[in-house]
Amino acid sequence: MYDQTLLAPLSFSEGGSDGMTRPFLLSLLLVTLVLAPSASADDGAVYFKEKVFPILEERCFSCHGGKEKLKGNFRVTSREGLVVGGDYGSGIDAESPEKSLLLEMVSYKNEDYQMPPKEKLSDDDIDVLTEWMKMGAPYDPELEIKGDESERRGFSITDDQRNWWAYQPVVKPSVPKVDSELAAFIDETKPNPIDAFLLHDLSEAGLTPNGPTDAKGLLRRVYYDLIGLPPTPEEASKFATHFASEPDHALDAVVDELLARPQYGEKWARHWLDLVRYAESNGFERDNSKPQIWRYRDYVISAFNEDKPYNQFVIEQLAGDEIANPTMASVTATGFHRLMQWDDEPADRKQHVYDVLADNVLVTSETFLGMTLGCARCHDHKADPISQKDYYSFMSFFHGVTPYETPGTIRPWAEPAELAAFEDRRKDRVAAKRKEIEALEGDMIDYLKEVGKFRKDKAAPSVRTYVDDARGTPATWSFVTSAPAPGWKEVGSKAFKNWTKAQGGFGTEGTPNSFVTTEWKEPKIWMRTNFGSKEIPESLVLEIFHDEDVEVYLNGVEIFKASGHNADYQFVELGQSALDAFQTGNNVLAIHCKQTKGGQFIDAALRTGPQMPGTLPVALNRGGKRLEGELSKHFGREIVKEWREAKNKLNSIQREMPGTPLNVVKESGSQPLPLQVHLRGSAHAPGDEVEPAFPSVLGGGDSPVPASYEPVKHEVGPATSGRRLALAKWIASPENPLTSRVIMNRLWQHHFGRGIVPSTNDFGQLGEDPTHPELLDFLSATLVEKGWSLKEMHRLIISSRAYRRSSTPDSQNLLEDPQNTLFWRYDMRRLTAEEIRDSLLALSGNLNPEQGGPWVYPELPPEVLATASRPGKGWPISQDMMDRNRRSIYIHVKRSLRFQMLADFDQADTDTPCAVRFATTVPTQALAMLNSKLVNDQAVVFAEMLRADGEDDLRSRIHRGLALVTQRKPEEAEVEHCVELVERLQSERGLTEEQAMERFALVAMNLNEFMYLD
């Protein structure tokens, strides 16, 4: 009677004939399925009239068919009413008719809704309705009663809604005059308009603002607000001296200096990444990494450092590939569209496609516009003038965007000739930088060999290389990419005689830190090389770079195995099993490596291994800060610092590749598929078709986007529709009433702790009203006047007297304005999670300032690693200590496995936009600061640094330590108290002075003065 195949899940793919794509044909089939029954019209009408209608009329119409208010808002007198559904959703499930809500109700399967409520239908009646659902729920047109579904879904905008403050044009207001009683709180020679607006409202409320904070408090404020790091005692002392004589000039000079530092971009990029729910993995059970997505993070950092005009910043993220003359940066920016969670095994693939698009609509509308469009996905917005049609018209701008894992979403950006020329230049630069590093390392390595402090055997045998890697003179390997015969890894095997021979360094160009000599693109590789030796070495070292899973054999014996990928060469001391496998004469080193996706690389070296490694990075990894202290004492800090900077620069040069793989947006073509309103938000219940349009209340609605936009052709990949560019230009327009207001409110929030509109992602009627609407409009208009420069707005805000106010409570003001709504004082705040960790590393001298590049993996406690959804796959700890000590913004953001200390201190959730981090106070925070390995390790290093600085006197070391922690000159009583603590720990607890100083360092790092800004 009906075609069951129409109910099968539909797949999506490109292509087709007759000028029509398969997705278009499939959507027509789906419309046919949902809006018309799959049985013939005559058969369906007859079945409905004879079998179904009598049941509905007798048992259902009285509650769900009259003209009065429908129970549950659910009508069954028409097919439209059945599809639209009521409070519990649509009555029909087109994919699984037997699971339709109507059948669930009449079968009494759910205690919450059993219909009819007085008496259950007979089994025969339920069978009739079940068969009817399988037919597609056809109705007899003559018996349908349409009712008032159209009225129920009607939408109109009232005058009050249209006149809502956020939808009005931004007009720069006049600066108010300041009451004479508060004139002392504004600089009359150089008045800041911010102060005038705030003082005007304070005067009307009868409140007097606080006076200024001290120089130390102000400097910490500026440093943490702009770069997220503390000033040094020397910087604090210099500022205090300058501030005492020329406060305005001193503050302006510091602000200019900090805005020019690269750390500014790292700090403010973190705020932005919270908004766009940045993560480097997909989430869900597998939670695989997003290849190359870190380049979007680096783009954001660079954009802030360059002071990229905010309107351009918006356009590049939404449509950086569609602008005229796109750059690598603008194309990288479209990684914005790839930040969502991605389920690679959704139960409902069609619905999942639209769930992803819905996520994009939500993030775009909240981040750039402060509009909660997501509330209109299933029905008209309950509070704001946003219809369901508005929602899907907005989604239509993104409708051509392909799913995350569609081939082509990760692609290189460079022409072959350009790439070849750049590679030649890069190799020359790498060679020159290596020569510089070798010169710096030479004397230090000789010194370490001489003192033998970190070597068990001072004989220090010379290193012999049996198999070299691509960084030196690469060995010749025999290899295949399909499974070889057994015995391939044994000495004397002839299974490899027909294998291909090539030099080591197998992989794909662009894999970070790699030295690709031989291209390898297949999923697996088996490789072996021979070497000879006249004697058995005392120790062996394997240096290996593997991406991803690897097994290493020596003469058929497995000597190393690892899963996941390394971001660089790893130094592995081989155990007794390797020495037992080693033999005089001929030896075979064999490797099997397998790769799943993304860039790939495998390379290895085998050498003899003295107890003291012959490379300085490995020596420092083993000896840590104590060894670096020895080197600094002998050679001077500047030499060691110069060596570290040279190493960082070498890493940076190795990553500079114009042929970079980019995780970018991709569209299905220049003509996206039609999009319909989804009834109740279901992709299986399409309604009226929509065109791209801006929200009605902002001038869109029935007027689609002007037809002036055209498909955009690209040198790489198919043409795109141009729709995203039209949307981006509208959002970034000075005439858009929301864009400048929203971003200025965010800037204010991150300087004052709370936005002028406290609900920073919601400027609608469910959000909070602005406390100072005229000030917000003044700042928004000024931003546009200043060419959308965020750095200029930082200068304006920080130069205000309001920013300098102390945090001291005032009893009268607290009674009148306990929430500090009028900004009469500065709101004290705790450092953010990233600021705490970065400050600890900076304090101990361990912070690695290297900029950009792939994510890093600091150590995680075993109990945290045990929670990984895929044990052993989640967190390959970075082997280089320097990498582990980079700023927190470079730590891998894995949705299912958070870096514990950052999570403890309220790091943003990565599943939804985070506009405001709410500071919690929970026991685990105190426990982390006292007991975690991270904090205790830094306390040990901090104490050692105080000793290594040459301060032999205990009192002097404590004085220096407190000055570093608090950025001020310690009081004598404080120093004396800490001296007593150290002495008591020695006398009463039996600790050595070194151990007692480590406890002092731990206590100092827990001071409120370190953890809070006031």
Model-found features: residue ranges?
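Aromatic- and Gly/Pro-enriched helix-to-coil junctions and flexible linker segments
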Residues: 37-321, 381, 401-462, 612-757, ...
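Sequence/structural segment immediately N-terminal to covalent heme-attachment motifs in c-type
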Residues: 47-61, 128-132, 360-376, 394, ...
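Short, surface-exposed tryptophan/glycine-enriched loops
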Residues: 300-304, 365, 570-596, 782-784
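An acidic-aromatic loop/edge-strand motif
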Residues: 468-485, 499, 565, 576-622
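Bacterial N-terminal signal peptides
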Residues: 26-36
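An acidic, gly/pro-interrupted, aromatic-rich
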Residues: 103-107, 193, 197-202, 303-305, ...
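Short beta-strands within extracellular/lumenal beta-sheet-rich domains
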Residues: 520-533, 572-574, 727-730
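Aromatic-lined ligand-binding clefts that engage carbohydrates, nucleic acids, or primary amines
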Residues: 499, 523, 531-556, 589
